[in-house]
Regions:
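A short acidic, Gly/Pro-enriched loop at the edge of an enzyme's catalytic core
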Residues: 161-172
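N-terminal, positively charged/glycine-rich alpha-helical extensions of SAM-dependent methyltransferases
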Residues: 25-72, 282-292
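Short alpha-helix
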Residues: 225-245, 256
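A short SAM/SAH-binding and catalytic strip from SAM-dependent methyltransferases
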Residues: 171-184
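Class I SAM-dependent methyltransferase SAM/SAH-binding core
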Residues: 104-162
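Conserved class I S-adenosyl-L-methionine
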Residues: 8, 47-98, 114, 118, 201-226, ...
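A short glycine-rich, Lys/Arg-flanked "PGG" loop and its adjoining helix->strand segment in the class I
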Residues: 186-198
Length: 292
């Protein structure tokens, strides 16, 4: 997928309708007149809403200010957590995506590209990786660092709750480190799942101290120092059309990573199927009615 093909694959993040590419290739316009700009380095500004919700705007500002020192700060956090092996753990995350050469992957919240580099390695040769972030400065830094040898790489500024792609576009989607602060988290999970083909993988993680550690002295200190570690794993936000859900605690059990496989539809339960071997009708529905 070259740059022109990437632009042609983008849809309106609000409506999902097609976009018209200007002759000079510098803008994309929706049917209702909303314009999205293509930057000089090819980064497409697909942010929606144009004026971000307060929480998302705050995160964008913070990351834009911290982009040069961000990697050192994150590595320090992981080092404090049971002296975790950051490189090995990040590789473990990407392995969960089950990528192969030639596949197409999306990373939401790519940051400076640490995990992105591992994703690129997995789909080489011939694969396509699309990287997005809220922060222009973070994404520009990733673009400067990452090698495009034997792989197609495309970048866009985007809100993970409004992805500019058609259904079933990717083989896998990855996000780590920001879902706790998403203003529309449930919608984000719906979007991350929607753009993955049936059978593909979604891998998501962030801060959340494991329940069995929260009352221990050391972790109680951690919870006071950074309220984000108090976040609960957002299992309730996961869509219905998934299977093989797994949850792992990592980085000293202070972060989680979840993985699941996308299905074409939600599972079904036949609550009216009669229980065999009885001389009277019995099923789940009747048992529920009796329990009321």
């Amino acid at each position: 997928m070259d740059h022109k093909e990437f632009l042609e694959s983008l849809v309106c993040p609000r409506t999902g309708s097609s976009l018209t590419i200007a002759e000079d290739g510098n803008t994309l316009t929706s049917n209702d007149g909303v314009t999205y700009e293509v930057g000089e380095t090819g980064i497409v500004n697909m942010l929606y809403p144009k004026e971000l919700l307060p929480g998302d705007a705050r995160e964008q500002y913070l990351y834009d200010q911290a982009f040069l020192r961000y990697d050192k700060g994150v590595s320090w956090v992981f080092e404090t957590l049971n002296h975790s092996d950051e490189a090995a753990t990040r590789q473990y995350f990407i392995d969960l995506m089950e990528l192969k050469p030639g596949m197409k992957a999306l990373e939401v919240g790519a940051g400076t590209g640490k995990d992105s580099a591992l994703i690129l390695d997995k789909v080489r040769p011939g694969g396509t990786v699309v990287l997005s972030d809220l922060s222009p400065n973070m994404l520009k830094l990733a673009q400067e660092k990452l090698s495009t040898e034997d792989v197609n790489v495309h970048y866009f500024l985007g809100n993970g709750s409004y992805l500019p792609f058609a259904d079933d576009t990717f083989d896998a989607v990855f996000h780590f480190g920001g879902i706790n602060t998403f203003s529309e988290r449930k919608r984000a999970f719906d979007e991350l799942t929607r753009v993955v083909r049936p059978g593909g993988k979604v891998v998501v993680g962030d801060e959340s101290v494991a329940p069995w550690l929260r009352n221990t002295p050391t972790y109680a200190t951690l919870l006071k120092a950074n309220p984000l570690f108090r976040a609960e794993v957002p299992i309730e936000d996961v869509p219905a059309n998934i299977e093989n859900f797994k949850l792992h605690y990592v980085f000293g059990n202070a972060f989680y990573i979840m993985e699941y496989r996308v299905t074409a539809k939600a599972p079904e339960v036949d609550i009216d199927l009669p229980i065999p071997g009885k001389d009277f009708v019995d099923n789940w529905r009747l048992r529920a009615e009796k329990a009321e």
